[in-house]
Amino acid sequence: FVSQAFNHKQISVNGGNQIRPNIHIDDLVNVYRHFIINNLPAGPYNAGFENLSILEIANIIKKIIPCEIKINNITDIRSYRLSSKKLLETGFVKKYNVSSAVQEIYSNFIKGHIQDNDSCHTVLWMKKNSIK
């Protein structure tokens, strides 16, 4: 979405009401560090925060990068929330949110550190790498 906003001044949203949990890559790395440093018990832990709709994410981007949001009438039934309560109860504290991640990605586009290519588009990248 950030690539679309930066390069095309428009974000194309399919549906928009689907919910997705979000986590910054640095927070994900910090989850692993947290487990290693604190020698926490093994088992399943969810690591995702800010359960936001796709449209909410697009609007966060629009506040940072002036662009239009085009909503396509395509139904995507994949929608899920997750709770990271178990992880948070171990003392883990997230440092980043979607807005700060968008700012970071946008800054890297401005600096030329990120280019608009297939790696910015999940479906194109998956097709190119024969992933179904």
Predicted features along the sequence, with ranges:
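C-terminal substrate-binding subdomain of Rossmann-fold SDR/epimerase-dehydratase oxidoreductases
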Residues: 5-132
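Anionic-ligand binding region
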Residues: 1
